[in-house]
Amino acid sequence: MIRTQIVLNNQNIQFEGIQQNWEHPLGKFSLHKRPIESGYILSLDVKPSRSLQFQEVICTIPVALEESDQIFCNGFQSWSESRTFQQSEYIPNLKWFAKPFMKNYGDYHFKQIKRKKGFLHSWTYTYTTKKNQELFFVGSLSEKKAFTLFQWNIKKKELQIHIDVAERQIETPIEIFSLWIAEGEEHQLFDTWGQLQGISLPPQATVTGWTSWYNFYTDINEEKLLNALQQLQATFPSAHYFQIDDGYQKAVGDWWRIDTKKFPNGLVNLQKQIKDNDYQAGIWLAPFICEPKSDLYQNQSDWLLKDKKGKFVKAGYAPHWSGHFYAIDFYQEAFQEYLAKVLHFFTEEMGFKLLKLDFIYAVCLFPRKDKSRAEILVDAIQFIKTHAPKAKLLACGAPLGPLFGLVDYCRIGADIHLKWEHLLLKFFRNRERVSTAAALTSILARHHLNNRFFRNDPDVFILRSDNHQLTFQQQSTILKLATLSGNLVFNSDEMSKYSPESKILFEWFLRWKDSYIKSVRTIEKDFYHIEFEHEQQSFDAYANLTSQYKKLPKYSKIAPYETIVY
């Protein structure tokens, strides 16, 4: 039986089953169950009798778990590792000594999460995969109002659903959550889930481009980027975007202060050259964070987000900046005025057509009395859309669910690393780590979001021969999986230096880039069977992300880190 627990004004309210206008001195509570589309919608309404403040909302539903069922767990934000799990697995906590540096990247500060054997957790949606490959699916229809945390209790065969409304105050009737629970085939379920949220994206060919980050990182200047632009024009004239990433500004947070030692002409000349070469210009912004050396931090400290003790909130740690960086309070009026001017400068005055918005999670680290974390995130992105109406938005480092239908593109995995794995960050158990292995796992797991809720950004492929420690087999797999799972695919290479083998792989990308994944089946951990369509024909692919040979039905074996398409 469904059980509901609501903690309001420090009073614990519990009831079982479906309820209509269940009365309590604090108000009326209704849990509705409405049949729809091979399942039902479960929603909770509250009509308060006075001003109320939530501490907790939990709904627990029984689930028919079979031993062979795999459980999909969606990570907290873009970079958070996401995949299907065996029931014997669990998601471990970040190591204690890493928490001062990394805890705010993900969900490590959510105390209600059980991180031990017998429990798994997911955000926004989750599902089990049955032996017949059909899914039992549970997805939020109200993620713009509050984050939804799903916690599986394997032994009890229960799914505990936490609604992130802690500290939220209400005085008028409100729908606390709305969930769609259904069974069926993957492709149809995700189509219906999008339709139930009122999201309909028109077909769009894959968007391509070049970004400065994965070759130069912050070591960019006008000369390097003009040379890269010239090379791109000579080798990939049909690309859409040329995107300037981190490193053009003097400090994170000071978007006005272009580093004139690197860019003596500012960005004006470079942007003009990009446009003259028939590319659209993109720019990187991290609008809701700043580093200590920035003017913003030093002179506008009242804009910074503060915790309950009045201390500035650390959003993370970046050794290539000033170490710890800090979250900004979006609702500071002076900050909003500043951000509006920054957006106008880059999009209207400078003519940038793509805004890569990074570290978005930082805007919603803490709820407010009048806003949940999700509502804060939606307000912030709506603000950017309002003040940059002509620009396409690429979100990165962002909780995904509230951005469905709001942004044009969204990163669906971690940053690609110049090695296969970042062993130190993996040892820290950082699920948001820079990692090629983790990135590929997540982009396959989240393939179903593409062209339904936004266009997927799987991150870059790397085909160059220098400045990385990837094998050619690994490079090939990165390119193939990005091609199949993404709708915005960039690279950072000096393409004129491609080897003959790299050129062949690049031609493969051009040939297959408008493919569409129908399903991904986890054969075993890090070994996948992919069914996809291209030009109305069906194809299969196998991706082996392990260091071992694997057996295939039509081939004798597949090599470590190899992806085969047939």
Residue ranges: model-predicted function:
Residues L44, E171, W210, F242, ...:
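Conserved, mostly hydrophobic/aromatic
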Residues T206-W210, N215-H344, E348, F352-L354, ...:
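Aromatic-lined carbohydrate-binding/catalytic grooves of carbohydrate-active enzymes
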Residues L267-I274, R373-A391:
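Alpha-helix-loop-beta-strand connector modules within alpha/beta enzyme cores
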Residues M1-D191:
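N-terminal accessory beta-strand-rich subdomains and adjacent acidic, glycine-rich linkers
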Residues Y297-E337, Q382-S496:
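Glycan-recognition surfaces
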Residues I478, A482-S485, F490, R521-T563:
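Carbohydrate-binding surface patches
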Residues F216-I220, Q249-G253, F288-K293, A362-F366, ...:
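Flexible loop/turn segments at secondary-structure boundaries
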Residues L479-T522:
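Aromatic- and carboxylate-lined catalytic core of secreted/periplasmic carbohydrate-active enzymes
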